Swiss-Prot record:
PROSITE patterns: CHAPERONINS_CPN10. The keyword Transcription regulation does not apply. It holds the Pfam family Cpn10. InterPro entries: Chaperonin_GroES (IPR020818), Chaperonin_GroES_sf (IPR037124), Chaprnonin_Cpn10_CS (IPR018369), GroES-like_sf (IPR011032). Keywords: Chaperone, Cytoplasm. The keyword Chaperone applies. It comes from Bordetella petrii (strain ATCC BAA-461 / DSM 12804 / CCUG 43448). This is Co-chaperonin GroES. Heptamer of 7 subunits arranged in a ring. Interacts with the chaperonin GroEL. It comes from the Bacteria. Belongs to the GroES chaperonin family. The gene is groES. The lineage of its organism: Bacteria, Pseudomonadati, Pseudomonadota, Betaproteobacteria, Burkholderiales. One of its GO terms (molecular function) is metal ion binding. Together with the chaperonin GroEL, plays an essential role in assisting protein folding. The GroEL-GroES system forms a nano-cage that allows encapsulation of the non-native substrate proteins and provides a physical environment optimized to promote and accelerate protein folding. GroES binds to the apical surface of the GroEL ring, thereby capping the opening of the GroEL channel. GO terms for biological process: chaperone cofactor-dependent protein refolding.
């Protein structure tokens, strides 16, 4: 099954970032305050304005992004955990 995001939504695959302190203690996701990282899998066409114009999404498939811990909606597709996130919930693109 494939997902095609609508409007200004973006499908993101969360990257596994094991968080450790300098001494090697693993910090669980529930205690981490840093934003999560992910890779953009698919991008919607953009958000429609009141006059009917489409504002394209400023991301593309393959971009590495930062997003908040509670951003988006989690979905499982073919056993893979993905997030459907609005463009405005993405904090930054990692370059």
């Amino acid at each position: 099954m494939a997902l095609r995001p609508l409007h200004d939504r973006v499908i993101v695959k969360r990257l596994d970032n094991e968080r450790k302190t300098a001494s090697g203690i693993v910090i669980p996701d529930s205690a981490a305050e840093k934003p999560d990282q992910g890779e953009v899998v698919a991008v919607g066409p953009g958000k429609k304005t009141e006059d009917g114009k489409v504002l394209p999404v400023d991301l593309k498939a393959g971009d590495k992004v930062l997003f908040g811990k509670y951003a988006g909606q989690s979905v499982k597709v073919d056993g893979e955990e993905l997030l459907v996130i609005r463009e405005e919930e993405i904090l930054a693109v990692i370059q």
